[in-house]
């Protein structure tokens, strides 16, 4: 398994013989392509079609984020592993209202269970509400209601004010951290989807759209409590992130370069941290947890096994 690379400095990324080269006025670094799983870009980067063709041939996605750290898009290589049969099953589960609702509920249940683990808030009432919902809007409303409780708890445990969730744009440091963490999680889940036969545009909780890979939004719901909420709490409580790591421009608050690097380092370390996975009777990385979740989803779509979302607390 290759590594995830993060580019935080302006420069040029190119193909150099049979490897990758990043260079600018201060540095020239060759990166063995066999060591690269995917690349996250947070700076101005010059590249050409020769590089893109090379990345495509190696199946390496390239994720782009703008100056403020918002996810803007992915160079998504042509899928090398496709399955018409699985695509048909994905669409069938979207078109069948009950099958779609089951999967949508599952993603929300996974989100609520993992939020319950992170914030130590009883979720029984909300899990029962989820089971009683009959539509996607009802379902999303229940999740949003529980999220509000969690955000109040987030303020308590960090001592930072959230006031209310603001996304476009984030208006304070806590909102900026949530938005940045969510963007990273969406992109990482998309990178893992690429390695499977799943089509990233067919989703169940979030409405499929011509302008986004909405399946990554669905699956990310299960992982955001661990990859975002839990990480934010730890970074603030350990004083690794403070108010000096943010900038504000035009009523928008965002992580500055130093803060972004701190968050990325912690995010990447979490991806590589291992945890015992009972079903396999061995430890796996948090990155592998995403892959295993996608395989469970595939088995459900193929009607080989009923999908049950990751309950992170149950792994402990």
Curated annotation (Swiss-Prot):
Positions of transmembrane segments: none
Subunit record text: Homodimer, forms a heterotetramer with a Cas2 homodimer.
GO molecular function, one term: metal ion binding
Organism: Aquifex aeolicus (strain VF5)
Protein name: CRISPR-associated endonuclease Cas1
The protein's enzyme class: hydrolase
Necessary cofactors: Mg(2+); Mn(2+)
Record's function text: CRISPR (clustered regularly interspaced short palindromic repeat), is an adaptive immune system that provides protection against mobile genetic elements (viruses, transposable elements and conjugative plasmids). CRISPR clusters contain spacers, sequences complementary to antecedent mobile elements, and target invading nucleic acids. CRISPR clusters are transcribed and processed into CRISPR RNA (crRNA). Acts as a dsDNA endonuclease. Involved in the integration of spacer DNA into the CRISPR cassette.
InterPro entries documented for this protein: CRISPR-assoc_Cas1, CRISPR-assoc_Cas1_C, CRISPR-assoc_Cas1_HMARI/TNEAP, CRISPR-assoc_Cas1_N
EC number: 3.1.-.-
Stated family: Belongs to the CRISPR-associated endonuclease Cas1 family.
